[in-house]
Amino acid sequence: MYIRTVLDRALELRDRRSSSQGKDMIRQAVEYINGHYTDENLSLKEVAGYTNVSANYFSAVFSQEMQQTFVEYLTKKRMERAKELLRQGDKRSAEIAAEVGSKDPHYFSFVFRKTQGCTPRDYRMGGRRG
């Protein structure tokens, strides 16, 4: 019975440490993403490398801790910034796409419409749904 109790406590401690390390890694990754999301080449592999883990491990832990995938988080971050830019002025959609890290303005418009429920132009004109 004593050995069982010691083993249970050891496993509990290991799990707590593992969870804490995962949360620290995610905090570090989110800070990195938030500082680099406008880089059109930002990738899961790059962020995983920044946090010193494999891309597969990073992807699994990120999804589990954040309740969304890396791509979903990055897209959401970029769309939030795009909405700010659309509200602030009259930059063209292609300029905004480049500013938020999108390589292709047409794909940016497609993703914006898919995630926000309206085109960037409609959003600017007042059809703000997202």
Model-derived segments and spans:
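…primarily DNA-binding HTH/wHTH and HhH modules…
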Residues: 110-130
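Short helix/strand-capping hinge loops at secondary-structure junctions
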Residues: 36-38, 69-70, 119-120
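N-terminal positioning helix adjacent to the helix-turn-helix/winged-helix DNA-binding module
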Residues: 21-29, 75-78
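Append "Primarily bacterial transcriptional regulators
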Residues: 46-53, 58, 62, 96-102, ...
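Basic, amphipathic alpha-helical hairpins
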Residues: 8-16, 30-42, 62-66, 83-91, ...
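Hydrophobic, helix-rich cores of sensory/ligand-binding and other regulatory modules
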Residues: 1-25
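Type III/flagellar export substrates
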Residues: 21-25, 43-46, 50, 70
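Terminal helix-turn-helix DNA-binding modules in bacterial transcription factors
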Residues: 64-103, 125-130
